[in-house]
């Protein structure tokens, strides 16, 4: 059974504090939007899908007990709070897309004269709650498409049928499992599906400095699931791909541009470069909500920069020389030219096919 990072019932939201893992498993109550903003900004919850879900559910928790004098007042409240939540971690596009969708719903309901303010609030709460189930279903589809893509490529290289390929070794970066989503995971969902098919020989996870999401969170999930797994340092990836016959790299995404350029956790870009050099397929696993067709390329993606302390300290212990300057971008952008395929809940697309394919899917 996968870990549960988000616990929700109407009027109540608790999140697993990921800053305390793996030493302590503690749930933190999110009582409203201010709490939601803080747990997202402080990275007590992280992962683009989970950020969107927790952000929107924090708004649902806040408005649930409130009574509004009019639909217009409710709509104003929704708009202001959603805009505030988007500012917590601006690189992750899922929160912005979810906010836009919920605001569009609020606008439509405000104009609908057949619905009163109580009905509008109920419809809004239902829409936010539906995000949980949809995210899990989308992740399971991503896992299935991704596993089949990796196995197909391995089989083709060996001149065999897809069903006879494997077991395979894969590498992942950062944390993209149940802790980063509502459940199952994106890139780690691909790993999970390979394991369920009996096709996972081994999974390697990077430590993912400076926040150590791989060492703290992915390793925690892999041990929990009892998958055959090994933790490696970020600086070991080239040696790993040269020595260990890795069949594919699969990572998540915080934002994918229309041309396929992908913003993901810092260190992803260099892994893609190394994978290209060694001829190892490099896949990005992301729901459609992580794809931003309004951004033409990676140069237009805003990259969040984090505090120096995340580099200079581990817990309360300083590990860097006092007085040294730091540069701490949370993400980097992997060029589309280094990406083999982008795995979504609707299939796997080459970066150059992405814009046209996603546009057609959204129009259908």
UniProtKB/Swiss-Prot annotation:
GO CC terms, sorted: cytoplasm; nucleus
Catalytic activity, EC: 5.3.1.23
Reaction equations catalysed: 5-(methylsulfanyl)-alpha-D-ribose 1-phosphate = 5-(methylsulfanyl)-D-ribulose 1-phosphate
InterPro entries membership: IF-2B-related, IF-M1Pi, IF_2B-like_C, Initiation_fac_2B_a/b/d, M1Pi_N, NagB/RpiA_transferase-like
Pathway field: Amino-acid biosynthesis; L-methionine biosynthesis via salvage pathway; L-methionine from S-methyl-5-thio-alpha-D-ribose 1-phosphate: step 1/6
Biological process annotations from GO: L-methionine salvage from methylthioadenosine
Coiled-coil parts of chain: none
Active site per UniProt: 254 (proton donor)
Taxonomy, superkingdom: Eukaryota
Site entry (Transition state stabilizer), positions: 174
Subcellular location(s) of the protein: Cytoplasm; Nucleus
The protein, known as: Methylthioribose-1-phosphate isomerase
Lineage: Eukaryota, Metazoa, Ecdysozoa, Arthropoda, Hexapoda
